[in-house]
Regions:
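General small-molecule cofactor/ligand-binding pocket signal
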Residues: 133-138
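Active-site-proximal alpha-helical scaffold in enzymes
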Residues: 1-23, 61-62, 72
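A short helix-breaking turn/cap at a secondary-structure junction
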Residues: 31-124, 130, 141
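Short helix-loop capping/hinge segments that flank enzyme active sites or metal/cofactor-binding pockets
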Residues: 95-104, 152-163
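Short low-complexity, flexible loop/linker segments enriched in glycine and/or proline
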Residues: 23-27, 148-154
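Conserved catalytic cores of soluble enzyme domains
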Residues: 19-36
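Generic structural signal for helix capping and beta-alpha/helix-loop junctions
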Residues: 17-18, 111, 144
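Conserved beta-strand edge residues that scaffold enzyme active sites
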Residues: 14-15, 140-142
């Protein structure tokens, strides 16, 4: 798709399988909220365990945001074989005030290239000029989350392989 062979592609994401390839290949994606896109898999040997349902998401990849939106709308249609699907609208009511955006302050011990800092500031400035309210926030300590996530994924993978 990034090479121009197709316009829209489908993928799934637990730990970045949509987002990282899109980032590395200069294309656009979104990891939809769980339940937005049906995830029924007729070829699966067994139903996926609940944590796999809660972490995995089906989503589109495309060369433009407009194509991703079009694909997401098509992919979000009801499939009665997926009990996790929810009828969430793609567009909600117009906000009553400015949309709030949190710009995470990077921890002092995190080594981040100056170009990344500049890009984040540039994005925040562009959002503010577009009417968004950008506030810097402290990042909570989530150091233990990564190990917990890895434990869950590892156990889920074992269960799926044994099915």
């Amino acid at each position: 798709m990034a090479a121009g062979i197709g316009t829209i592609a489908h993928g799934n994401d637990i730990g970045g399988s949509l987002r990282w390839p899109a980032h590395c290949n200069g294309v656009v994606t979104i990891k939809p909220t769980q339940g937005r896109v049906p995830a029924y898999n007729e070829s699966a040997a067994a139903e996926r365990p609940m944590p796999a349902h809660l972490m995995s998401a089906q989503g589109p990849l495309a060369r433009s945001v407009g194509d991703v939106r079009l694909a997401l709308e098509a992919m979000s249609q009801r499939d009665p074989r997926d009990p996790w699907w929810v009828p969430a609208p793609l567009v909600g009511p117009k906000p009553k005030g400015p949309i709030k955006v949190a710009l995470a302050k990077l921890p002092d011990d995190m080594d981040v290239d100056a170009s990344v800092h500049a890009a984040l500031r540039q994005a925040a400035d562009a959002l503010e000029r577009s009417g968004y309210r950008v506030s810097e926030v402290e990042v909570p300590d989530i150091s233990g989350v990564w190990q917990t996530w890895c434990d869950i994924i590892t156990n889920e993978t074992v269960v799926l392989q044994e099915a």
